[in-house]
C-alpha cells in the first residue's frame, strides 16, 4: 500500500465538498480522478499533499500518518517526520510552479538542497540524470521562459522525482498541452508506474487522456456521495 485515505471530510461553510471519502492507491497503479471543475478534485489533492486541512479523516502513506480521525492537523513529533511524510509525495501542479529566475537544473535541486539531503554536486548529477530520463538533457542551463508547455511539464515531473516519492500526484497535467504533447506526457507517466513502481494519482477532466493511461478511473462525484 502506498496511500490510504479513510473517512475524509471537507466543507466550505454549507458546501460539503468531500464527505466520508475512502481511497487507496497501490504501487504501479495509475488512478484517474475524473470529473468536471468544482467537484472537489483539486481540494482532495491539496489535502493529501498537506497544502490544506480537512475537517476530519485519516491519511497514511507507507506507514507515515498525516492525520488522525479528529482532523487533519499534522501529528508529527519532529520536523524530520514531517519531511519524511511530504517526501513520500511528489506534486506536479497545473501551472508547473517553476521558479522563473532559476535555471532548469536549479529548479530541480532547490528543495533537496534546502533539506540537506545531498551536497550540491551530487544533486546536480541526479538532476541531470532525471532530465535525460524525460528527454531534456539539453535544457539543463536554460530558464523556464524558453520552454514550451510540454517541456515545462517534463521539468516539473523531473523536479518532483528528485525526492524519489512513492506517490506522484498530477493536477490537470494536460490542460495547457496539445494532444501530441499530452500523449508524450502520458507515455512518461505510464513508464513511471510500470518501470519504477510509482503510484500515480491524476486529477483531470480530460476523459480521453484518463482512459488512455488509467489503470483505474474514479469519479469525483463520489467525494460528496
Provide a role label for each language-model segment.
Residues 143-147, 151:
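Conserved ABC ATPase signature
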Residues 57-71:
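Conserved ABC transporter NBD signature motif
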Residues 49:
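Helix-to-loop junction immediately C-terminal to a conserved catalytic motif
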Residues 168-171:
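Catalytic Walker B motif of ABC-type/P-loop ATPase nucleotide-binding domains
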